[in-house]
């Protein structure tokens, strides 16, 4: 258990949602908790957004700082559902919160306006003969110019009875992209080069090349070997 070392303290909270996403586009994954007390006997509890500050003390564990209050999204309402999506298509992920004690709230992210980093949004499109239509379960790796590799899975459903945009969202910091690597659920890996930053990339699944059937050739060779082995015996009997 490394949460205390990382600065993540949620032991006394009632957490309904947990999301890793790069809210500030700096290239590392931040951590969101949607929190809501379940009855009047528990004191008001606040949502948390832990900003990933990297490994500040060299212990091999990323250090996190809760910035939800600073950003104005802490609140004390019962946040029982959260969905992430870039609703305004500006390149950063916005947060939709559903509460049991008030109406839905949509928080617009201003990371792009603040110029904190570049981004990439990947939409996977599987085929009938390959993976599923949204590429659920597939692995996406973004290889950056400095050698960093960003890795995410495509998934469906998160938190308490929730689901977010199926697009896979990457914050890139100030890096450019060398190439993209998609491993489909078929096991086939597809490479995409010349990928632009600050763009939406639609990836159509490539099916693996068909496996060649050599059974007819193998049967012919085995038959020939058998004939050669039996030929002396057949000659003596004739």
Walk through the language-model features, giving the residues of each.
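Gly/Ser/Thr/Pro-enriched helix-cap/hinge segments flanking short amphipathic alpha-helices
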Residues: 69-212
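Beta-propeller blade termini
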Residues: 14-25, 51, 80-89
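Acidic/hydrophobic-patterned starts of short beta strands in beta-sheet-rich repeat architectures
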Residues: 25-34, 90-98
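C-terminal cell-surface addressing/anchoring modules of secreted/extracellular proteins
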Residues: 206-236
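Surface-exposed loop and turn segments in beta-propeller and other repeat-based domains
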Residues: 2-9, 69-73
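Secondary-structure transition/capping motifs at alpha-helix termini
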Residues: 22-27, 56-61, 86-90, 113-114
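Short, conserved, GDST-rich strand-edge loop motifs in beta-rich repeat architectures
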Residues: 34-42
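Beta-propeller blade repeat segments, especially FG-GAP/WD-type strand-to-loop junctions
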Residues: 1-2, 41-67, 103-119, 145
């Amino acid at each position: 258990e490394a949460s205390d070392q990382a600065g993540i303290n949620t032991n006394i909270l009632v957490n309904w949602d947990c999301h890793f996403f790069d809210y500030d586009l700096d290239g590392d994954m931040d951590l969101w908790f949607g929190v809501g007390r379940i009855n009047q006997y528990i004191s008001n509890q606040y949502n948390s957004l832990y900003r990933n500050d990297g490994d500040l003390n060299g212990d091999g564990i990323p250090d996190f700082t809760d910035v939800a209050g600073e950003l104005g999204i802490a609140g004390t309402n019962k946040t029982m559902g959260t969905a992430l999506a870039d609703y305004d298509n500006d390149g950063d992920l916005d947060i939709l919160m559903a509460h049991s004690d008030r109406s839905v709230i949509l928080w617009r992210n201003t990371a792009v306006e603040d110029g904190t980093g570049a981004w990439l949004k990947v939409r996977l499109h599987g085929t009938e003969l390959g993976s599923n239509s949204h590429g659920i379960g597939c692995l996406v790796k973004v290889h950056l110019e400095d050698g960093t590799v960003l890795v995410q899975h495509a998934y469906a459903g998160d938190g308490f009875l929730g689901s977010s945009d199926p697009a896979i969202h990457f914050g890139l910091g100030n890096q450019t992209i060398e190439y993209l690597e998609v491993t489909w659920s078929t096991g086939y890996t597809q490479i995409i080069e010349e990928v632009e930053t600050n763009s939406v990339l639609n990836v159509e699944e490539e099916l693996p090349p068909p496996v060649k059937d050599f059974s007819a050739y193998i049967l012919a060779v085995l038959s020939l070997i058998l004939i050669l082995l039996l030929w002396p015996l057949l000659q003596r009997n004739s």
